[in-house]
Amino acid sequence: MSLNMFWFLPTHGDGHYLGTEEGSRPIDHGYLQQIAQAADRLGYTGVLIPTGRSCEDAWLVAASMIPVTQRLKFLVALRPSVTSPTVAARQAATLDRLSNGRALFNLVTGSDPQELAGDGVFLDHSERYEASAEFTQVWRRLLLGETVDFNGKHIHVRGAKLLFPPIQQPYPPLYFGGSSDVAQELAAEQVDLYLTWGEPPELVKEKIEHVRAKAAAHGRKIRFGVRLHVIVRETNDEAWQAAERLISRLDDETIAKAQAAFARTDSVGQQRMAALHNGKRDNLEISPNLWAGVGLVRGGAGTALVGDGPTVAARINEYAALGIDSFVLSGYPHLEEAYRVGELLFPHLDVAIPEIPQPQPLNPQGEAVANDFIPRNVAQS
């Protein structure tokens, strides 16, 4: 099975060390463009662009990278409760059209009550997933070309429609990750690819089996992906030294503050990440070559595969054997590590190299009539 390898655009900061300003670098458009172009040249399928108040806006960043890349896809966040599904569908179709079919979407419900309140969202965990399920139904139906009437608990639309369809049919793929039962049910019923953070393979296997069974109950099959950091070097010793160096400027106070911030979230996945290290520096290798040091201060994905190219490839293939076909990777700093992964890891894997999309046929289009419909030729009698 060929593997889809993604990279990451660090719109919330980058550098040589975690938890410190030392060794950091400016995150401007030029730097992000360098990373995107490196990923494009090296054969990554796409890049994940993060979302939230600590990041630059993912949609604007993605749009700005379209003209400077050729085949790279952009995995950007859909935010139920923050954005209406009709507006999100228009945005999704436009990004897909402008990128010539290079848009992918990641459903993000949110987990930090403080950040959600700042965005005007006061729903609890269960309510957010209810709203996300309704959002996704409307969003998908619009992209399928339907005129939508929907009267749900959280979302109400009447006569909603999309005048400009996406390039990808029936619609651009929808990714999603969540560890709670309600999240897995949403994934099973509505998404195309279920993402998990990089837990030990036996825990990932349990997740996949649960989601696969839930999807089968809905008569569906879905794909699977994993989100991991990577520290790959020419030798295993060099890789582990690089891992230790990454947290060498990290003090206990910063770790404690980070763990306190994570504790206030209602994310089951974040709780599972924190339980892998319990905020302690010792015993960070939680599974062969799987290191939890990143999660001491980084929210979300907090584990890294560490080793030389063949060793890391063997661990990736262990995940692939569970049914995972997509790997969303990152490393610090992201420009240099994109090359290291491409040069030291990719030769040991069956990597699916994306093709450059062909131009779409030019279809003449008149101005929308009364902001309501696109004029079509009428057959002459």
UniProtKB/Swiss-Prot annotation:
For this protein, the record's Gene3D superfamilies field holds: Luciferase-like domain
Q: Quick check: keyword Membrane in the entry?
A: no
Entry's transmembrane regions: none
Q: Which cysteines in this chain are paired by disulphide bridges? A: none
A biological process from GO: alkanesulfonate catabolic process
GO terms assigned for molecular function:
alkanesulfonate monooxygenase activity
**What is catalysed by this protein?**
an alkanesulfonate + FMNH2 + O2 = an aldehyde + FMN + sulfite + H2O + 2 H(+)
Q: What is its EC number?
A: 1.14.14.5
The enzyme class is oxidoreductase
Query: What Pfam families has UniProt attached to this entry?
Result: Bac_luciferase
**Keyword entries, A-Z:** Flavoprotein, FMN, Monooxygenase, Oxidoreductase
Matching PANTHER family: ALKANESULFONATE MONOOXYGENASE (PTHR42847), ALKANESULFONATE MONOOXYGENASE-RELATED (PTHR42847:SF4)
What role is this protein assigned?
A: Catalyzes the desulfonation of aliphatic sulfonates.
Share any extra remarks: FMNH(2) which is absolutely required for this enzymatic reaction, is provided by SsuE.
NCBIfam families documented for this protein: alk_sulf_monoox, PRK00719.1
Q: How does it assemble?
A: Homotetramer.
Q: Belongs to which family?
A: Belongs to the SsuD family.
Q: What is this protein called?
A: Alkanesulfonate monooxygenase
User: Could you tell me which species this protein originates from?
Assistant: Escherichia coli O6:H1 (strain CFT073 / ATCC 700928 / UPEC)
In the UniProt record, the gene name given for this protein reads ssuD
